[in-house]
């Protein structure tokens, strides 16, 4: 059976502001199943942003586990991410999950992968999902050549990804921490 997948999640950090956004498309194979899914959320008393790409059920499972790790480590984003990645890599059932997360709080942005990687993005820009490369390239160009806010950069980057990637649409949800 095919999995639900396909999305774009992008995050931009500039100064003391961070924005994280995603599109709303969910596909099953080559069929659009839903256009308004919410793949970007606020968790841990609205202090942490999280966006997910990959298999929808897998992503929700990881999101629940990440939230539990945040609670356990009193909101320490880096510690929670490392602990989730360790579990993800060593637990036989978790290893089968196909998803990625971008997480951000007031000071830190991290990408968490199923390979057990916890990555601190270069230049405060990161993107995941099927349209991630398009969104990341657009965001990098906008950061280097404009004074736009992180929110505006994320919005424009998702728009460009939506124009280019068939698994990304223009229904955007963007969250910010300032």
UniProtKB/Swiss-Prot annotation:
The enzyme's E.C. designation: 3.4.25.2
Reactions catalysed, as given in the entry: ATP-dependent cleavage of peptide bonds with broad specificity
Gene3D superfamilies found in the cross-reference section: Glutamine Phosphoribosylpyrophosphate, subunit 1, domain 1
GO BP field: proteolysis involved in protein catabolic process
GO cellular component, one term: HslUV protease complex
Chief location of this protein within or outside the cell: cytoplasm
Record: residues binding Na(+): 162, 165, 168
Regulation: Allosterically activated by HslU binding.
Record keywords: Allosteric enzyme, Cytoplasm, Hydrolase, Metal-binding, Protease, Sodium, Threonine protease
Enzyme class: hydrolase
Entry GO MF terms: metal ion binding; threonine-type endopeptidase activity
Coiled coil ranges: none
Compartments in which it is found: Cytoplasm
Signal peptide positions (record): none
SUPFAM superfamilies, per the entry: N-terminal nucleophile aminohydrolases (Ntn hydrolases)
Domain of life according to the entry: Bacteria
InterPro entries (alphabetical): ATP-dep_Prtase_HsIV_su, Ntn_hydrolases_N, Proteasome_sua/b, Proteasome_suB-type
Catalytic residue list: 7
UniProt-listed PANTHER family: ATP-DEPENDENT PROTEASE SUBUNIT HSLV (PTHR32194:SF0), METALLOPROTEASE TLDD (PTHR32194)
Cross-referenced NCBIfam families: ATP_dep_HslV, PRK05456.1
Quaternary structure and interacting proteins, as annotated: A double ring-shaped homohexamer of HslV is capped on each side by a ring-shaped HslU homohexamer. The assembly of the HslU/HslV complex is dependent on binding of ATP.
Function summary: Protease subunit of a proteasome-like degradation complex believed to be a general protein degrading machinery.
Family listed: Belongs to the peptidase T1B family. HslV subfamily.
Protein's name according to its UniProt entry: ATP-dependent protease subunit HslV
């Amino acid at each position: 059976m095919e999995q639900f997948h396909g999305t774009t999640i992008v995050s931009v950090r500039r100064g003391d502001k961070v924005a994280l956004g995603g599109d709303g498309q969910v596909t099953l194979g080559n069929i659009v199943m839903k256009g308004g899914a919410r793949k970007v959320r606020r968790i841990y008393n609205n202090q942490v942003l999280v966006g997910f790409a990959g298999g929808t059920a897998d992503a929700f499972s990881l999101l629940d586990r990440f939230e539990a790790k945040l609670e356990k480590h009193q909101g320490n984003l880096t510690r929670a991410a490392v602990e989730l990645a360790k579990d993800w890599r060593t637990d036989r059932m978790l290893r089968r999950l196909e998803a990625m997360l971008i997480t951000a709080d007031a000071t830190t942005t991290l990408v968490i992968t199923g390979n057990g990687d916890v990555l601190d993005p270069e230049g405060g820009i990161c993107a995941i999902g099927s349209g991630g490369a398009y969104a990341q390239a657009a965001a990098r160009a906008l950061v280097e050549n404009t004074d736009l806010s992180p929110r505006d950069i994320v919005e424009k980057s998702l728009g460009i990804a939506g124009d280019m990637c068939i698994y990304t649409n223009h229904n955007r949800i963007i969250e910010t921490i300032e």
